[in-house]
Structures are given as structure tokens and as C-alpha cells.
Regions:
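Flexible "cap/lid" loop of the alpha/beta hydrolase fold
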Residues: 71, 79-111
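Post-His helix in hydrolase/transferase enzymes
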Residues: 216-231
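Active-site loop/oxyanion-hole signature of alpha/beta-hydrolase fold enzymes
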Residues: 16-57
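Hydrolases whose catalytic domains are alpha/beta-hydrolase-1, hotdog thioesterase
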Residues: 65-69, 192
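Gly/Ala-rich beta-loop-alpha elbow adjacent to hydrolase catalytic centers
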Residues: 58-66
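The serine-hydrolase catalytic nucleophile loop
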Residues: 1-6
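Conserved serine/cysteine hydrolase catalytic core
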Residues: 152-198
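Conserved loop-alpha-helix segment in the C-terminal half of the alpha/beta-hydrolase fold
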Residues: 7-8, 179-213, 219
Length: 234
């Protein structure tokens, strides 16, 4: 996800990248639950950084982890930065139905780069041709450049998708000494503004006239500059 920005970030910060259980080709693991995975991240930060870091950034699912760490208060971060995460939540039954519907579509695409249903591949190709490079850049960020993801199991993807939906994120999260910043892609829709303000007491919204994670996927240099600007505020 962050291949284009790690080196420039490392010029200013000590960078640690999180790989989730079940999504790292160097391990034979399955993704457990959001809470278990959050606890593992927190334990690593406690062991290697005395429980204190300058900033944590997460996009999509990663933003849920940043929110959970901010709410739990096990570790301290000066800045919690979310990259336009949707923070969707659901009761267990609807979450099971949604997972059952989405898994047959997402899993083949994630592991092979192709949907099982031909009309979805045609639709994707149409988006690619009509777009300005965002679709290809986003897919490249999600799947990696030429990376073989066939090691990811359906169980890991199922656990990740379902657990993210049913794991509650508190409202009015306001950890002492932590600023919450959100890279808010306006093209995602106005409902997310209200969602961010519900879950976080004082979020700083960086409004971008872009689509979900477009800044990171298409404009990595500008993304790095924004992250550096955020982390210079204290």
C-alpha cells in the first residue's frame, strides 16, 4: 500500500509498517479479529517504542485500527491520522449477509486481479478507460505491483471483513494529548463528515476534492508533504 511513500517518509521519520495476520506472505497466519489484531499492534509499540509514537496512519481498514487504538488508550500517539476510512459498522446478522455477498466478489479479484463475473470485469475496464488513472493507481495500491496474493485465504478475508463491521468504535473519542486528523475525500460523500464528527470529539478534517485514497494512490509526493505538515504542528 505504501511502497511509494516509505522512503520519502523515512527521511523525516522512523517508519514502521504494519502487516496484518493473514496478509503477509512471510507468515502462515490467519486474520483473527479486529480487537486481537489491534492488541498485537499495541504490544509491538509498547515493546519497541515504550508505548509512545509520533503518529499512526491508516487508510481503509487501517483507519479502523487507528480509531480503535485512540479509543482504547493502551498506547500514546501524538497524531492519529485516518485516510478517509468509511468506518462502517453493522449488527452481526446484516454483517454476515454482507460478508457472504461480498466475499465471492472481492476474494477472486484480490488474489488474481480478475472478478469471477465477466460483467464486473467489463465494468472495471470501462472505468479504467474513462478515468484519469485513479482506478489503476488504486488497484495497484491495493494489490501491489506484480505481487502474488494467492497465499491469502478466504478465511482471513472473511474474518477481516466481518470483524471490521461488527467491532464497535466508540463515539466522541478524545484521547489526552492526541490530535485526530482525517484526510476527507469529499467525493466519498457528505455522510462521512457526520460520521467522523460522531466518532471523534475534535477531528481535524483535511478536505480533498478527490476520491477515496486518491491522494495516496495518485499523488504520493503531496501525501507525504501533508503528513509531514500535520506532524509538525506540535
Amino acid at each position: 500500500n505504501f511502497g511509494k511513500v516509505i522512503e520519502p517518509l523515512a527521511e523525516t521519520f522512523r517508519v514502521a509498517c504494519v502487516s496484518y495476520d493473514g496478509f503477509d506472505e512471510t507468515e502462515q497466519t490467519q486474520f483473527p479479529t479486529m480487537i486481537e489484531e489491534t492488541a498485537k499492534i499495541e504490544e509491538y509499540i509498547k515493546e519497541h517504542y515504550d508505548g509512545k509514537i509520533c503518529a499512526a496512519y491508516g487508510c481503509s481498514l487501517g483507519g479502523s485500527f487507528v480509531g480503535l487504538m485512540a479509543a482504547r488508550g493502551v498506547i500514546h500517539m501524538d497524531y492519529g491520522i485516518l485516510g478517509g476510512s468509511d468506518l462502517d459498522q453493522s449488527a452481526k446478522l446484516p454483517a454476515k449477509l454482507m460478508t457472504a455477498l461480498m466475499l465471492p466478489m472481492i476474494y477472486p479479484f484480490l488474489t488474481t486481479g480478475r472478478f469471477r463475473l465477466p460483467f464486473l470485469n467489463r465494468k472495471l475496464e470501462k472505468w479504467r478507460k474513462a478515468g484519469d488513472g485513479y482506478v489503476d493507481a488504486f488497484i495497484g495500491m491495493m494489490r501491489g505491483a506484480g505481487v502474488d496474493l494467492s497465499f491469502i485465504t478466504k478465511e482471513s478475508l472473511r474474518n477481516q471483513f466481518y470483524s471490521d463491521l461488527i467491532t464497535p468504535l466508540a463515539d466522541a473519542i478524545n484521547p489526552a494529548g492526541t490530535e485526530i486528523h482525517i484526510l476527507y475525500a469529499l467525493k466519498m460523500g457528505e455522510k462521512y463528515r457526520a460520521r467522523y464528527h460522531r466518532h471523534f470529539a475534535h477531528p481535524v478534517l483535511h478536505e480533498l476534492d478527490m476520491q477515496h485514497e486518491e491522494l495516496l494512490a495518485v499523488h504520493p509526493k503531496e501525501w507525504v508533504e501533508l503528513i509531514e505538515d500535520i506532524c509538525r504542528q506540535k
